[in-house]
Regions:
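Metallo-beta-lactamase
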Residues: 4-12, 103-154
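Short glycine-/acidic-enriched loop or helix-start segments at secondary-structure transitions
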Residues: 26-27, 61, 88-89, 112-113, ...
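Active-site metal-binding motif and surrounding structural segment of the metallo-beta-lactamase
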Residues: 57-102
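Conserved beta-strand hairpin/beta-sheet module of binuclear metal-dependent hydrolase folds
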Residues: 7-66, 155
Length: 155
């Protein structure tokens, strides 16, 4: 995969750490994508650090280290378990063992089918419709959106 990191800062505190993959010609083995695909992941740097989804492991480490600048991750937010969003959850969870995994109840139930993460039960922070996670000045408000794409989707 030739994935290209874009050094994109959305704001001083919100950084894009995704990558473009121009070598993929079919998304989910079904949809033609002649220009490739973007894997989207973001970091919010506040009193607490949150990583929103993960991308392909060949790019996650470099992209994440680039913006963390020595800080550690407090929260790994898992919007859903589709591989282009979640492929690197285990690697990130292992690298940041203190990080809580923020996810829906459905995603928590599904997660062990995809990944073997140490101390999973105590690391999960299950959020539901209307919950808020305070990072400092930034607050994440959760909306459950099951079957918008996958059964456990939250935004």
């Amino acid at each position: 995969m030739e994935a290209i990191m874009k050094d994109t800062y959305i704001s001083e505190a919100v950084k894009y750490i995704g990558a473009d993959d121009t070598t993929l010609d079919l998304f989910e083995s079904q949809y033609q994508i002649p220009n490739g695909v973007s894997y989207n992941s973001y970091v919010i740097l506040d009193e607490k650090v949150a990583v929103m989804d993960t991308i392909d492991e060949r790019k996650t480490d470099a992209n994440l280290e680039n913006v963390l600048n020595g800080r550690t991750v407090d929260y790994l937010v898992i919007s859903h378990l589709e591989p282009d969003h979640a492929a690197n959850i285990k690697r990130a969870a292992d690298k940041f063992p203190q990080a809580q995994l923020v996810l829906s109840a459905k995603a928590k139930a599904m997660l062990p089918q995809f990944f073997d993460i140490a101390h999973l039960e105590e690391r999960c922070l299950v959020v539901k419709e209307g919950d808020t996670l305070e990072l400092g000045t930034h607050k994440l408000h959760y909306v459950m959106a099951p079957m918008v794409h996958w059964p456990e989707v939250m935004v």
